[in-house]
């Protein structure tokens, strides 16, 4: 199925994992203490694709799911949200990945994953829908797909094909340390593709992890700059975000809400940003316009924290604009 959102809009193709998050029905308890869980579709790249589509953009997802009930359910959720699913493969031998999420009382999360191996890890380069990837105006990805072969080779091939076709490359490492063999391997692989990206978004926690510096300031952020980068973003949770280009840098405050679950907030932020720039990359060169885009992205991220689960909480364009209007009033 192809996306039905405006065919004249540029396509955002998101590559990587899609999985089921099991979110506890109460906050502030351990997994063993939780009395029940809500089944919530997730996976950062898939979240970004749906975030773009919810906001009226065109999005596609490339990845691999298990040929099981959960896998077909997830593909159906993409279709229901007008995300092109022609880049999906199904694996008959491996299951769809699962993650059990512990919600702290402040809405922050801890994860326990079931995926050794899961279907997303088994995507091969020869299974890629290259025609779909070549049609991307923006190609977005994370780092979880770099952890093991054959998915790592598929990731590298997809990135290369998208770049050669003229796509803007967007990278959100989305660090999940328990999935990596060691912190050192995580840093090495995350940084191995760093200089390929045009846009990079990291959280304050990821900035500290990658640099080894506990001080979150401009100097620390700029240590991750590379010459071909167009935009570096550092998200700071309730403190908004910082932005860096070759010509200017600054910060944009976020909106204070009663956070229930921070799952998907960063993906909502990224989706909003990509949807705003996919057809007009000159935004990246004009600070005032970029600040407006980032304010909108911050609003989308904030809205996403007010509900449990990532995908159910991603806002529509109307919801985000209504939220911003209330903030002004």
From Swiss-Prot:
GO terms for molecular function: ATP binding; fructokinase activity. GO terms for cellular component: cytosol; extracellular region; plasmodesma. GO terms for biological process: fructose metabolic process; starch biosynthetic process. It comes from the Eukaryota. Its EC number is 2.7.1.4. Keywords: ATP-binding, Carbohydrate metabolism, Kinase, Nucleotide-binding, Transferase. Pathway: Glycan biosynthesis; starch biosynthesis. InterPro entries: Carboh/pur_kinase_PfkB_CS (IPR002173), PfkB_Carbo_kinase (IPR050306), PfkB_dom (IPR011611), Ribo/fructo_kinase (IPR002139), Ribokinase-like (IPR029056). It catalyses: D-fructose + ATP = D-fructose 6-phosphate + ADP + H(+). It is an enzyme of class 2 (transferase). May play an important role in maintaining the flux of carbon towards starch formation. PANTHER family: FRUCTOKINASE-2-RELATED, HEXOKINASE FAMILY MEMBER. Belongs to the carbohydrate kinase PfkB family. This is Probable fructokinase-2.
């Amino acid at each position: 199925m192809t996306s039905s959102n405006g065919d004249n809009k540029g396509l955002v193709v998101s590559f990587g994992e899609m999985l089921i998050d099991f979110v506890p029905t109460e906050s502030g308890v351990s997994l063993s203490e939780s009395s029940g869980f809500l089944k919530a579709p997730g996976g950062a790249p898939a979240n970004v694709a749906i975030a773009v589509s919810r906001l009226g953009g065109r999005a596609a997802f490339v990845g691999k799911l298990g040929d099981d009930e959960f896998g077909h359910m997830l593909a159906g959720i993409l279709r229901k949200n007008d995300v092109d699913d022609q880049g999906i493969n199904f694996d008959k031998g491996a299951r769809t990945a699962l993650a059990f999420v512990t919600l702290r009382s402040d809405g922050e999360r801890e994860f326990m994953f079931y995926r050794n191996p899961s279907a997303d890890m088994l995507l091969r380069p020869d299974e890629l829908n290259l025609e779909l990837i070549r049609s991307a105006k923006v190609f977005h990805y994370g780092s979880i797909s770099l952890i093991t072969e054959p998915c790592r080779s598929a990731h590298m091939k997809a990135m290369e094909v998208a770049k050669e076709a003229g796509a803007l490359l967007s990278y959100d490492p989305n660090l999940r340390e328990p999935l990596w063999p060691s912190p050192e391997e995580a840093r090495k692989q995350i940084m191995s593709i760093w200089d390929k990206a045009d846009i990079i978004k990291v959280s304050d926690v990821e900035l500290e992890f990658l640099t080894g510096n506990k001080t979150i300031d401009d100097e620390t952020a700029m240590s991750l700059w590379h010459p071909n980068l167009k935009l570096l973003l550092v998200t700071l949770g309730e403190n908004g975000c910082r932005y860096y280009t070759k010509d200017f840098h600054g910060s944009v405050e976020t909106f204070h809400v009663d956070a229930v679950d921070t799952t998907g907030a960063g993906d909502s932020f990224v989706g909003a940003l990509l949807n705003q720039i996919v057809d007009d990359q000159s935004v990246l060169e004009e600070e005032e316009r970029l600040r407006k885009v980032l304010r909108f992205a911050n609003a989308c991220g904030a809205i996403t924290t007010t509900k449990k689960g990532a995908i159910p909480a991603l806002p529509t364009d109307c919801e985000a604009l209504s939220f911003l209007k209330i903030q002004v009033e």
